[in-house]
């Protein structure tokens, strides 16, 4: 009988919710040489009906929810199905061998299971011709792990997982479940506490907070972007005009944010109109708070459900690709929130979070930092990045808060952190993680870009890993951004004393490959909108806006502008309301909008702005010493070509000079291409006179230009051979 097969201690552990290997005695068990026995566990059930080889049979009830029935010798999982309490007729979850293997354990423990997103979480699966869902989770400190959902009435005793690895990996294949099934993990900690957790590897969640995960087939979507993906592999130096977007507040319809599909069409058309090459999305990874920016991530493998399904998000990316617009994701591997339903103390103890510092919470955000010493945690983060690149076709990752990852003492006081093994402040494990991330991303997905938000002078951020660098493609030039805003907010009368703020960044502009950000961070927390930062009356404010944004385009480095800046959003950005698109009905805003579109078009069309822009040879000063008139001028070159250039002139005072001479030699011809003070952009109309060469015995020594107030002029220059 069943008592001879099943150990009473195993049953006791099962009934009390502490069993780590239910497959040891549940499922198909050999009873003797002539027959098998099917052993089932149905807590609270009075009867269990089984379809065995086409015949209906009632299992015998023993005790404590244990049922059994005899079966022919050699019975297979395909030979019988169980009528479950929810009405589902499906095969026995406890009749199948483990699917997680030794190779999986080895790679996961090494932190190199780069397809971990196909093995962890809830994966639609087919085993021996039987369809269902494979549930896998890492919880090394747990006594017991169960999957709960509507299919078992959220009863954690019904479907306990089996521990399949000494690493603490748990697994259960449940036949008959399908895509869309709701589920959570029920975890019994080492201390006996029962925890209900969402899936760290969940690909879809319901409305937060405390939302259950949903089973998703990430491969179901049919992509139409093959041409884009192939072209991306072979990218060389290219223009990057990035439009930074918060999905929930870009545009609304009938009082709600646009969904992914509607947003795809409107945003793609808008980016083409404005000549943006890429969009960068503030984090769309799942997060608990509706009114947040998305940086408190609880679902690292799931696009937020607020705007649609994962398939809707795939459509969004696909559509932008078909319109030749890239998609960059703001990704947050530096810290995670303390919400108890997600990663925090996942199995009852610190698992994903670091306990290296004396104070576990990050002082700036009151969040946990990841434990980069643990390879399984590193693999979780690498898997997240690679999932978005593989399954969602993302073109780039902007890695948030890199500085906080690089330094152990970031934001901490003395006594709140411990030095590394060399006595230094560098977080050696985080640095290795970053190098690993960039190496594997660039190897597995050629053409994908990575960006570092890094605010210190940490060396070699954009040098290759093989050359001792961190391996990023670009670093945000936050120094340039701070200097620029500090200068432009000064009244023009006093700018002579701040001239170095315009010139200082050019001393280090080629130490790294830089992106120049005018990002969301500068229009929040009381800093005001870009327009509000500008000094002067209304006309002067808009002249400053045209000057700022054209200066941004002309400077060496790739470009990023946060939404609303292109038409001078009047108020500070907030994530819980849409941009003020009605402002485009006002001439000043419409003129600026037109000016930005023209500047972006020039930027994309003229390689002088972007070809080799990370190299010293792409830039040469013409004049940086005119502090009295607040003028700077410089050449931008296209790669190694020195036969021609763009001459960029920026005038930061409100004065007007009908004749202003720049001392520049060997010019053969010079033609005005762009004037931010043109009437068509809302300017005064000054500065449109074509330049006049200054000659001495037929040799040019300078040019005479008309210099309008608060304006940028761009000239195309051919040099004497």
From Swiss-Prot:
InterPro entries: A-amylase/branching_C, Branching_enzy, GlgB, GlgB_N, GlgB_N_E_set_prok, Glyco_hydro_13_cat_dom, Glyco_hydro_13_N, Glyco_hydro_b. Pathway: Glycan biosynthesis; glycogen biosynthesis. The keyword Glycosyltransferase applies. It is an enzyme of class 2 (transferase). It catalyses: Transfers a segment of a (1->4)-alpha-D-glucan chain to a primary hydroxy group in a similar glucan chain. SUPFAM superfamilies: (Trans)glycosidases, E set domains, Glycosyl hydrolase domain. Disulfide bonds: none annotated. Its EC number is 2.4.1.18. GO terms for cellular component: cytosol. Keywords: Carbohydrate metabolism, Glycogen biosynthesis, Glycogen metabolism, Glycosyltransferase, Transferase. The active site is at residues 400, 453. One of its GO terms (molecular function) is hydrolase activity, hydrolyzing O-glycosyl compounds. GO terms for biological process: glycogen biosynthetic process. Catalyzes the formation of the alpha-1,6-glucosidic linkages in glycogen by scission of a 1,4-alpha-linked oligosaccharide from growing alpha-1,4-glucan chains and the subsequent attachment of the oligosaccharide to the alpha-1,6 position. Monomer. Belongs to the glycosyl hydrolase 13 family. GlgB subfamily. NCBIfam families: branching_enzym, PRK05402.1, PRK12313.1. This is 1,4-alpha-glucan branching enzyme GlgB. It comes from Chlamydia abortus (strain DSM 27085 / S26/3).
